[in-house]
Amino acid sequence: MPTNTVSPAEFFSSDRQEAELSLIACPGAEVLTQQIDTHLVNWAREAGIEVDSFIAPAECPRFQSGDAKGLVKRSVRGHDVFLVVDPGNYALTYNLFGNTNHMSPDDHYANLKRLIQAVAGRAHRVSVIMPSLYGGRQHRRINRESLDCAVALQELQAMGVSNIITFDAHDPRVVNAVPLMSFDNVMPTYQVLKTLLKNRPDLNFHKDNFIVISPDEGAMSRNMYFSSVLGCNLGMFYKRRDYSRVVNGRNPIVAHEYLGESVEGKTVFIADDIIASGESMLEVASELKKQGAAHIICNATFPLFTSGLQKFDEAVANGTLTAVLGTNLTYRSPELLQRDWYLDVDCSKYTAYFVAAINHDMSVSALCDPIQKINALLEKHSAPAKV
């Protein structure tokens, strides 16, 4: 459980529970919601509470014109409601005038608002689990442009949402848009290391054998944390851009420049929040391989692979990449899950901890800072831990 002193029986005792718990899966988030529900049901049963599921069935059916509505199929009056949404699930489709449309983040966000409306203010409290923050990559204004994430957070607050739980936000400072709303930005560092060591138990984190490298300046904070807890050194790349041109909505990258010590003969770990097309990650890996890196392991909380898997297959085949880690917090294609080089990190239990803690009005501080669990994991694998 979240702390070593709390047992499932104490955690799910009725006198500590804020209100009866209900989970609602937005279309496209059913798998993750079911996994979260499985953990919660198991803990409740350990506490002597007989329950089959906490999930309240819901859907967002569409009319032939493309309009949709939110529908919750059982009462949630007085419940502590948690809605789970995956804005990155592009595999979901709907028909529009005879054409098949893939769901965009905008569609998923609209469905979330529909289901909040369907609850219609009857719930005791409404929380949103949005692992991939809607509009999170548009977190600041540089020109005459929208601030989608900030406006979305303000909309959710106005609709009565009390808590937002997100993972590895592109820039967590977006919470400044809603300073009076509970906002938890969760980093799955422990889950990533646990999966990595399970699949690569021979890893040696000594600074002579292992180095953490940030792919750009924006990812420095998460890579600094990895290097600090592992006790190894840190390097980084910075991107030189051509600010005179805009290609596909951004200034094109001219080159990746490396700042750091030699990587020759070392295992390199690169962490970022998103693998979109993956071009930057592959360019960084290629440059490190040219400098003599022995193995290169990439990690991204949200493995989108918007340009497909072929280039990553080629990078693994020619020895540039060793492995890629990604979480189950967003949709992953069946083709990706079948790749030998891809390691899937299960964060459903971690998410369930947050649901249970918030439902019982308990502190989540121990969940947000898992350093004790990380140190115990590294000690178990005889790796030098450093706080």
Positions of the model-derived regions?
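PRPP-associated nucleotide enzymes
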Residues: M1-V387
